[in-house]
């Protein structure tokens, strides 16, 4: 009897090995699949949150300039309205670029909440617009740039730097209009379709911010 028991144990052993092998194989492939899925998952970072925030800000600035355009036309300041159209298009391009970058990371941009804007006279809107641009150029984007540098997010870093340059130009155009009391000449505004930089001259071959060809700029 003792001999038979030993034989039974030996015979059952290969089956146990087979079952264990199958189990280990399944566990291995399951683990590999999880690892692959984890690699595809984008880990949340402050820069990604900043992209959502910047997208919302740019969309609200776009809407703000559209409202300011209507007010300038009402106040019979057509040239100021033309400036606002160019700035509105510029902000729209900024927002679209933030969307593209988020989607390239497989992240769907959040729907931005509308910011209430009080629309005064055309002259008042010029001062309000300049204040907004100075905050973005002097405070918001420098902070976003520092974070992108720390988190080693080169694409976001480059995008933030380019938009900061574009916003600096916005401020320059608005200061000029304010200094003249809104009495600005009729200008042909050129907006870079790649980064939203605004020019008032064609006496250059490339965009100062993103190096795109001026020949491809949108005429406003």
PLM feature segments, named:
Residues 3-19:
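Bacterial N-terminal signal peptides that target proteins for export
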Residues 29-31:
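C-terminal motif of bacterial Sec signal peptides marking the signal peptidase cleavage site
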Residues 33-220:
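Non-heme di-metal
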């Amino acid at each position: 009897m003792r001999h038979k028991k030993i034989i039974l144990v030996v015979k059952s052993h290969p089956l146990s090995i087979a079952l264990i092998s199958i189990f280990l194989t399944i566990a291995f492939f399951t683990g590999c699949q999880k690892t692959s899925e984890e690699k595809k998952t984008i880990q949340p970072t402050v820069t990604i949150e900043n992209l959502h925030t910047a997208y919302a800000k740019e969309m609200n600035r776009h809407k703000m300039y559209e409202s300011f355009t209507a007010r300038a036309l009402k106040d019979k300041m057509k040239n100021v309205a033309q400036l606002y159209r160019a700035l509105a298009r510029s902000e729209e391009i900024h927002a679209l670029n933030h969307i593209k970058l988020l989607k390239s990371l497989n992240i769907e941009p959040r729907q931005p909440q509308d910011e209430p804007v009080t629309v005064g006279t055309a002259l008042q809107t010029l001062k309000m617009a300049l204040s907004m641009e100075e905050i973005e150029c002097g405070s918001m984007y420098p902070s976003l740039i520092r974070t992108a540098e720390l988190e080693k997010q080169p694409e976001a870093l480059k995008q933030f730097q380019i938009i900061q340059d574009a916003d600096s130009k916005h401020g320059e155009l608005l200061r000029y209009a304010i200094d003249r009391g809104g009495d600005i000449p009729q200008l042909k505004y050129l907006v870079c379709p790649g980064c939203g930089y605004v020019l008032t001259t064609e006496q250059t071959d490339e965009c100062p911010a993103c190096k795109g060809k001026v020949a491809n700029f949108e005429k406003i």
